[in-house]
Structure formats: structure tokens, C-alpha cells
Amino acid sequence: MLYLMSTTVIPHGADGTWMMITVSTDQAREIARDEHVSAVGHQSSADAMSAVLGITVAANRLTVKPEPGDEFLCLRLRRRPPEGVVLNLQQLEAIGFSWALLRYDG
């Protein structure tokens, strides 16, 4: 399964082997076209990801329990936002971000 996430934090209890590669925005758009489940917890993050990826990303506070072979397309901020701040697309772009593809091998 492919999950969309707004963080690269590994879910609790998902010990094992993980692989992470940085992907370009164009690659992220291509990957996001595949069937996926959104695990993006905040509407503002979902809206920003929707704008950048060119697809609808739903806000969905989901606890993910990875299975071997699952992949995660993750938004990676270049630095932490200020405490309690919910970022819009312009603020996200000002901070800077990249994309990572994580794979869980169990």
C-alpha cells in the first residue's frame, strides 16, 4: 500500500528495516497518481500537498500499521515550523521542503 504523509516519522511499533530515498517533485507527482491512502493529519497540510502534487489529498488522521512492502510518500520540511503554527502553502514554500519515499521491509 502507498501512504501519503506530511512527515517522515516512522510509526510507533514499526521496528525493522526501512529504506528512504529523496525524490523530486515531478517524481512525487508520478508516485502520488498510484492508488494511495492519505495519512495526512491536518487540512492545511493536505491542501498544500494537493496544490503541489496536483491531486486531491484528503486530511485523514490515521494511525498507520505498516506491513512489509508498504511505501510512504512523505513531505519533508527543511526546518521545524514555529510551535503551534499551522502552515499554508506560501509558508511551506518559504520554509522549503522536499519529498521522500520510504519503504518498509519488515
Feature locations, PLM:
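Acidic, low-complexity, intrinsically disordered interaction modules
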Residues: 34, 38-81
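The transition from N-terminal targeting/processing segments to the mature protein
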Residues: 16-37, 83-90, 95
